[in-house]
Amino acid sequence: MMEAMDTQTPTYSNDELTAALAEHLASLDRDDSYRVERVLKRSSVETTELVYFEGTGGGSLGPFVRKRIDASAQIGGAYERLFAAQRAGRRFEHLPRIVDCRRVGDELNVVMEYIEGETLEALVDRLGATPDYARELYPALCDAVGELHAGFAIAGETSAPVIHRDLKPSNIIVTGANYTPDDGLTFSSLVIIDLGIARVWRDGADADTVKFGTRPYAPPEQYGFGQTSVRSDVYALGALLFFCLTGVDPKPGLDMREQCEARGIPTSLADAVCMSMALDPAKRFASAEALGLSLIH
């Protein structure tokens, strides 16, 4: 199950979240203030829960998403950087609002806003695969990844790209999506979730310290053949474009041009998929922005 569920549940604005939680989060017993509604996802290194914050006066706020990450797994650092940037006043259109992030013993606990909507996976399943996604939704997805790549630097810091490393249909939340033949695909917002294995790019590094990912969407360098970079996420964006156009994941190890032809993808879109998913990072689009612009012009 994904973070975006129960679309009838009310949500709160950023200001409401901050004002309502500020007093309670000053307590040293924060964990005791959260009621776990249910577990959304569990792995060997991370548990994702749907929680409500129980106030001292008996009221509650929520829902929120809480991630409890094993600190020994060396993941989750992007949440800490995002939290610091948001507390410093930065706002991100395509990333979740973090309301609490701290280390407790050997865990990193992250509490964030609950995003209403449906995953890209569910959206394509509901509406079907169509080239309209490339014209309407996909440029917004490239903008969202570009926002991540711009980094989380605050005043006085040098900005460095944040590489998601696990872009896939279940980690993209779309709100208010609707499709008609006359209007095409319309939607309200698009948010990237699950920054657990995201990492900051390091100049001079030869390879990533921790290797994770989802096989159809992960480039070769993510498995020890070099350091991941913004072009690694461009590879995943190419795979996401293939998914939007076909409704299926690309098959690793098979020629992408042949896969596109077999699915009847228009040549201009197939060119974008194949260039994005080139095995050599140097042959891919240089940025998410460049990929997005190639679909507009």
Tell me the role of every PLM-derived stretch.
Residues 91-100:
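Conserved HxN/HPN-centered segment at the entrance to the catalytic loop
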Residues 296-297:
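Conserved small/polar residues in nucleotide/adenosyl-binding loops
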Residues 207-221:
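Conserved activation segment of eukaryotic-like protein kinases, specifically the C-terminal portion
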Residues 44-79:
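ATP-binding glycine-rich loop module of kinase domains
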Residues 105-119:
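Conserved short submotifs of the Hanks-type protein kinase catalytic core
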Residues 233:
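Conserved catalytic-loop aspartate of Hanks-type protein kinases
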Residues 149-175:
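Catalytic-loop of the protein kinase fold
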